[in-house]
From Swiss-Prot:
Induction: By stress conditions e.g. heat shock. This is Chaperone protein DnaK. Signal peptide: none annotated. Keywords: ATP-binding, Chaperone, Nucleotide-binding, Phosphoprotein, Stress response. Belongs to the heat shock protein 70 family. Pfam families: HSP70.
Amino acid sequence: MSKVIGIDLGTTNSCVAIMEGKDVRVIENSEGARTTPSMVAFSESNERLVGQSAKRQAVTNPTNTLYAVKRLIGRRYDDPTVEKDKGLVSYNIVRGDNGDAWVESRGQRYAPSQISSFVLTKMKETAEAYLGEAVTQAVITVPAYFNDAQRQATKDAGKIAGLEVLRIINEPTAAALAYGMDKKQGGTIAVYDLGGGTFDISILELGDGVFEVKSTNGDTFLGGEDFDQRVIDYLAEEFKREQGIDLRKDKLALQRLKEAAEKAKIELSSSKETEINLPFITADASGPKHLVMKLTRAKLESLVDDLVERTLGPCRAALKDAGVTAGEIDEVILVGGMTRMPKVIETVKTFFGKEPARNVNPDEVVAIGAAIQGAVLKGDVKDVLLLDVTPLSLGIETLGGVFTRLIDRNTTIPTKKSQTFSTADDNQTAVTIKVYQGEREMAADNKLLGNFDLTGIPPAPRGVPQIEVTFDIDANGIVSVSAKDKATGKEQQIRIQASGGLSDTDIERMVKDAEANAAADKAKRELVDARNHADGLVHQTEKTLKDNEGKVSAQDKGEAEAAIAAVRSALEGSDLEAIKSATERLTQVAMRIGEAMYKAQAEAGAAQPGAETAAPGDKVVDAEFEDVDDKKKSA
């Protein structure tokens, strides 16, 4: 039975884990790291780079290095947060054919789900390399405050990567699962999750293997990227004040600033001061310019103070929805790389009135929880029940543009709810059902998830037809909506797909692209391996001929030189079969030369005087020896 992997698909970094027996193992990638940068780049030759290899070349290839794409997933191009993001990233954000926010690199447009699928493929390959077998099933985590469109887009990314996504699980819930798995006592816990791009807070009740989410809240556009941006802006402003040059207008300089800002932020979690040194950051008529600046922890904290403070609003809302006070929280778990920042730890400690738990790795705990959930779904782990909630209210637009809720936020999922509505006009034969998600009273102020028509309603006075609208939320938090005319039994149903979203055709095309790329990558790897093998064989054969000049027959030497020339000729092209064929021919010639040399050596050895074996009857004399240890003699 194939294994189910747990993947934390993060904004900045991703992580993959697997359940082995009773233990969970976080799997190291090919570079030996336990987390992988969620970055994808396209080189000049259009080679796709993922993870650390993409991050390494980001400074020299800023417009084609895609990072923090998770912030765009499931969002419309005209979303205000997308507009804000356009001014912060070094790559191009463009409008997709469906109106969603897509990204562009080297003239090619990609859906955020597609870019995320490249990262998921890397995590899948990491697990396969460790397990030595194919992996087809996964549990993938998302921020708890992700809406339906973002969840669906994440599931699509898994499908494009060739994974059957058994469950989409909320990141704080996964962290709680990892934390509470071995805990005997129950209690109320708060999971404070501040990652690279998003913030979540969840309140959970733990007890007897039941993990029940009481409430969740958050901000899907608040995380480490915003903290980095504050440092970037500060450094750029200081440099502009001193040199009169705005580094943010130079994409190469901006990428170097971004790397330096992230490094400085991390260093200031353990030290009080750090130096940022970027030689030759730019140049003007007077010559090259260098950026050398000191940044203290106190200055960093003053730059990001309001961002840390912003996390407390959702915390208050989550406590209120759960019906508990901060003092009633038994344990606070910190998740996400940003929670290593002393200012964040201090703020959480002050708000909840207790020291946060330090016995979980904030970078790995989410992937560990996802792996545990995978084992639960497979039946390998028993007596664990996860009860999650929907983060936002769901409803439809009714007369006057009002948002009528059918399912309130923090309702335990899976869930199903129906309500009967009627027509607004006399003789109305069709109704349009507009589905929204959010907390505002007017529908237009909330997120439109999708709409559909129910037609064929018999003409009747307004208010007479009975139209039953049913919302169904599955365990992944993904919504289906149906509308049924009770008189005729006619029904219309849709799986919500954002206002745009990827169609099944789009997903199928992207799956095929991914498969084609996998085949192309395999072919490229085979060609490189064949070239390396051929080069090595040519070098070895030439060395053999040179070292054994005079010992190889003229015929064999001629054949070897002809075979070497054939290999070199094949290496000038890219025909894999031609290289293999020429290499095979050279291998045969080299083996024959080797055999001839060994044979000649054996014959020469046999002919040498003193090499004969003792004839029968010859006197054999035992040698006398001394045992060094025992100082005994024997004859």
